Amino acid sequence: MSETKKSGIDYWKQIVVVMSLGWVAIWIYHTVLTPIYPEIQASLDNVSNAEIGAIASFYFFAYCSMQIPCGILVDKFGQKIMLMAGFTLFIIGTLCIAKANGLTMIYIGSLMAGGGCASFFSSAYSLSSANVPQARRALANAIINSGSAIGMGIGLIGSSVLVKNMSMAWQNVLYIVAAILVIMLCVFTLVIRGKAKSDSAQAEKQTQTVTEDEKRAPLFSGLLCSVYFLYFCTCYGYYLIVTWLPSYLQTERGFDGGAIGLASALVAVVGVPGALFFSHLSDKFRNSKVKVILGLEIVAAAMLAFTVLSPNTTMLMVSLTLYGLLGKMAVDPILISFVSEQASAKSLGRAFSLFNFFGMSSAVVAPTLTGFISDVTGSKEISFVISACLVVTGTLIFAVVTLYKKKATQRIASA
């Protein structure tokens, strides 16, 4: 009995490490092209900024549009098969970009890469929800999530050093990324357990009738819908920061190149300890999880507003640091843990895919809308205020829905 218990503990720890490394690999790809856009433009006969920017748009379009289908397939076929299939497509897409001699092939590669990545979120967090002890779940999700910050740093710094300082061809950077993805594919194959035949048979049997668990926890319950919307609002502010903060600091706050990079990286770097601390706090006081979420969201909204209202550079840096510490990176693992508690075990993959679909939709909306507002008004400040208002709105809706459900539960219990 002790051996079984030990094996189980070992497996959930392996999952946490492997899924964190998966995020590292994905975010290396996410950010590796951004610093070397000028080199890519030069190799393609100086195509326009809009055409270069569309590379990321194609990726996120495929990533978002495949979230829900991948969630359904994860529930049906299991995480291992979907991770292997997804990363295989991801590798092919990355190699297409590396070997491309024109913009069309790069767009096709971006679509394939985005589609391949789409299976990771629902696979990773349904695996952690199914295997990690509930008392450690939010902390485990925070460790998994921290891989994105590490990957972002490696991608931004690595491509800059290799291409700009060491004069490596930008295509070779993509070959390096593809090699990293191949390694991760091998790791998934060796570490992740496949879906047992007994589980498949049981799942097939369960499709004939709707379980009582699913009746109590539909994917579009009022509570889950409020979480989906809150996550959209949370991610809107984050992707506004990721996309437009460097430009805002340079054009409207007078930062120079080195300071821009430091300030932008600060948001991601300080997010890791914030996520680990608050997820541990959430695990320790599980009954107060909603209060932790509400507190973090309100402070994050205030910091988004203070970013543009700060009268000097010192206050601006304090606002950015606190946003990184208390914003999306901190609340992500707690929200993920909350979703895992509200959705039924059978539909975890679909629940997480819906959750991430709404969040990543903001990555498509926020950059474009901010650019439009900037063109019309000549400033990006109003966009930061809008993002803060969105976070407050999402938080209030979530608070009202959770309070209503709590009172309804108390009435039923006392009846």
Language-model-detected regions and their locations in the chain:
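Conserved MFS/SLC helix-loop-helix module at the cytosolic interface between two early adjacent transmembrane helices
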Residues: 65-103
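C-terminal transmembrane helical hairpin of 12-TM major facilitator-type secondary transporters
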Residues: 288-335
